[in-house]
């Protein structure tokens, strides 16, 4: 955050944040409201939600939704972390793919026919069409997402400028800590769910306010969220489904339904199920997203109705600093998308999916807490934060 502000000289900072389930196909550690508090305490001025229909998706759709929201908010500049660290290289790579689109698409198909996952096939295709040192390594996860951000900016004819910050020391999927006080999201999650886990183990890798709010969530609600807590619900659902039922679920393609129904029979945990399910053709993340759609019963028809090929249909405001509130007041007439401060009375196909995802997310809670949290989510107004006193209002 500090590097972003230093690099962009921004007047205000806006974060587009996933809701209950994340792009890599797993539940968020804590609710979006606690994560909103974390973001505000760390210097973000406006926090808005990326709807489930965009957030639990491949990088292209994820980026398209996020950029459409930022564009609607009249953001002048975006900043993202990447393994490459040179923004010119992202523009060069997008340009190279466009110029070699026919060859690129043919190569992707060729590599997929050889049994590779889409992500692997794409990475291999880029290696064949990109020879210059000024192109990015498309096998790296943050480079892939950054590439899609730039592509979305150009496709949406946005005037938005882009900056990138090089990720040092720790890669996104690294599972262990290093001694440079930089840790990946994966390693932090792994530590939090390990035996004898302690928040003190991660305190040097995350902001103090974040550590405090993580501890507070676990104390108040008795848990942090991970896939294993949903496994019994997930397995029960699959045990009651036929292959035909599964084929209606979003991202269940190419006979994957048969493999899923076969492997769930002998799996006693989500991790063991994933180990049995994974193949060369499907990445772990791709399979986790498919499992998330099964858990939330998100169908192909629902995603079609959400019209994800277009921009996000609304802006759900989760939190704001005083500076952020001033920005919205000054610019609200220019913002064409509806800004939702709650979802109780608004109706849209995208929001129908969102409500289901929230219901599933809180399903691991005991009653009456589960019902209370679900009701609160629909009526919850944006969290307000006074940055001068560092207090929530």
Swiss-Prot record:
One Pfam family here: HIGH_NTase1
EC main group: ligase
Biological process according to GO: tRNA modification
Chief location bin: cytoplasm
Compartment annotation: Cytoplasm
SUPFAM superfamilies with a match to the protein in the record: Nucleotidylyl transferase
GO MF annotation list: ATP binding; ligase activity, forming carbon-nitrogen bonds; tRNA binding
Catalyzed reactions per annotation: cytidine(34) in elongator tRNA(Met) + acetate + ATP = N(4)-acetylcytidine(34) in elongator tRNA(Met) + AMP + diphosphate
UniProt KW Zinc keyword: no
Keywords: ATP-binding, Cytoplasm, Ligase, Nucleotide-binding, RNA-binding, tRNA processing, tRNA-binding
EC id: 6.3.4.-
Amino acids binding ATP: 81, 142, 167
GO cellular component: cytoplasm
Alphabetized HAMAP family for the sequence: TmcAL
Similarity comment: Belongs to the TmcAL family.
Described function: Catalyzes the formation of N(4)-acetylcytidine (ac(4)C) at the wobble position of elongator tRNA(Met), using acetate and ATP as substrates. First activates an acetate ion to form acetyladenylate (Ac-AMP) and then transfers the acetyl group to tRNA to form ac(4)C34.
Protein's name according to its UniProt entry: tRNA(Met) cytidine acetate ligase
